[in-house]
Amino acid sequence: MRLHHIQVTCPRDGEDLARRFYRDGLGLTEVPKPEALAGRGGCWFRDFDPEGRTTAEIHVGVEDPFTPARNAHPALVADDVAHLESVGARLVRLGFETTWKDRHTFDGYERFHAFDGAGNRVEVLTPAG
């Protein structure tokens, strides 16, 4: 088995903030939702390797009432430490809460945690250089 996607949620009309975080901040590509699901709201994002294969997929669904996931979270792997730092800096520039306090607390990795526009926690990590 392998993981196909993870889903996080946002409040109604939270898609634009999701796009700022997942597309503009993390650098993922927004992909169209299947027509049968498009009416539910939300948006989907993917990352691809150089050969065009999907390497990560995050679905942002609309939930009402909404409660952010402040602890449970997806973790995305950056290419290297420079990429990790670049993504973290971009999220800060975009105004998203980002913390490096646990940068060296996971043996063999460097990482940061950020919170999307709805308050959901996301981890970005890379093998320590």
PLM regions and their residue ranges:
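Core segments of cupin and vicinal oxygen chelate
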Residues: 9-55
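Vicinal oxygen chelate
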Residues: 3-12, 43-48, 65-129
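Short, charged/polar, Gly/Pro-enriched secondary-structure boundary elements
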Residues: 51-58, 68, 118-122
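Amphipathic alpha-helical "stalk" segments
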Residues: 3-4, 39-44, 55, 102, ...
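Acetyl-CoA-dependent GNAT
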Residues: 61-65, 127-128
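A short beta-turn/loop motif at secondary-structure boundaries
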Residues: 35-38, 64-66, 103-107
